[in-house]
């Protein structure tokens, strides 16, 4: 890496000649050996510390450091200085000149001691992974050798992140449980989630793995090439990987396949109407095989990270015949499932999101049959999820005003608008927002019930304590932007050099800093239900006013931060997953067991009502609607349908959710017998063959 930082501490100026002590002084090293003191070695060491802190010294600052160190050494009035004392002098000089480098120097100075502890922790974790496995990520199969190696590396990477990136205050906040830094094992290396611009990469051809790929000329080749792009690019990040509007991406390649097939049948002398019918059938077959290939590839071929990337595709707005065919066929393939004959089950990836436009998919509208195919698929497989483009709220406002679709990244993250000319704000009425090709750099979540408990225990104002942790997360995000900006485009060529990301036509040696201006950073929120319970003993079903007030306060602070820092911060309704159990343990350790707060084994996800609440789907939609526009950086509304494959009821509730502007998830209790293939909503034992081998 040939950065300005490196050039700075490789310059030829010898400060040892300019700044000398008043006598010969030796530095006594840890092994007892002695070396003549030379302040040039101090400059070399602190230069490296500055490089690790993403800064550099001016000539004047270096001279200040040299003068300080030489003066202190002279004051000692000894001929030999032990290395620990020399370290203290240098550290003190750095505190005077540039405190951020003092921390970097201090952290690195103690690395040997810390590495012993870190490697011991990694060893213990590796033994657990090797012989027991790991359940932290549902997208990894810890039985595989490649995954075990990845998990062990991740543990080391997590330790390095805590040691060399987080401040003492941040580490303490994480250990206590007031904040949670997501994906510590990967944040030093790369990005979080994205809306990858596959179409931009494909157009005109691209380079991958030092081999040139021509743009596909048929649909079947397009499926293969897109599959390779997705797996390669998704391996270079750690969050959800979304291919937005996949129906529109595939449409031109379907047209090419159709024209080729039609020409073939015409050469054979087939009647025009028969040739058209057969050509369409061929394209349909290519769609079926292509989507089936994706389902096998994305669910069985692990990435180089050792996991199965969280791949999402969005579709539904294409009005052309091949775009409609793409969406309907994708839904049919998902509904039928994969596996042995009579034992087929729906797969997980790619997650499908249906882009719902009332003017296209509503009753009697041109794409109503596409909507019907989606409902039928949801009733069988719980997917697609449904994103409203024409209801209320932020996503719909972008679509209605600009015709721009804000597809979700991964399971629920959404990008804030970034305008072509104005950036964070539109330059004028004609400025357009851009979403495709952008990404998120990471999320840090607040544990709100713990923050309230801390404020009460310490007799402090709740919002004062909350603002402290918001500021902590803010500073962490600022350093993350700066740190990632120093990375080179060669770390993810498809994204940074071949056009997968907005502005991604850099040279391999270029820094990626220019691409970060449109990237978001997330402030996550969890356990709003438990926050309300702790506040006044009432759940979100019974009250919720305080939870709304808190979320409004967070929104206000984040808006201020955005304007002051020029960064696209977003508020994210955290999908707590394993975190929901960890947070209960952290709360109990500090504040004990409190009814409705920490008496269960898990807290609620984001602003969701607790899963134990006895409420109807409509009540749940109405209750969670209060928080919808306060969590625009990430959210989803789930409803569990207690009805036996009643597609009309599901359709009614989806329509209602779309009117409300929701991103709606369909939850059903579905069970499959792995022995005979029987399926029904809920079963502990298969009623057909008596098997307990159920999925």
Segment roles from a protein language model:
Residues 2-129:
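Charged, amphipathic alpha-helical regulatory modules used
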Residues 25, 68-75, 311-314, 530-533, ...:
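Short, hydrophobic beta-strand segments
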Residues 37, 81, 515-520, 694:
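Structural motif
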Residues 47, 70, 474, 478, ...:
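Amphipathic, well-packed alpha-helical segments that form the structural scaffold of globular domains
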Residues 98, 116, 302, 477, ...:
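A structural signal for well-ordered alpha-helices, especially hydrophobic packing surfaces
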Residues 122-517, 538-540, 544-694:
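Conserved catalytic cores of very large enzyme subunits
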Residues 521-534, 552:
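Contiguous, well-ordered alpha-helical segments that form the cores/surfaces of helical PPI scaffolds
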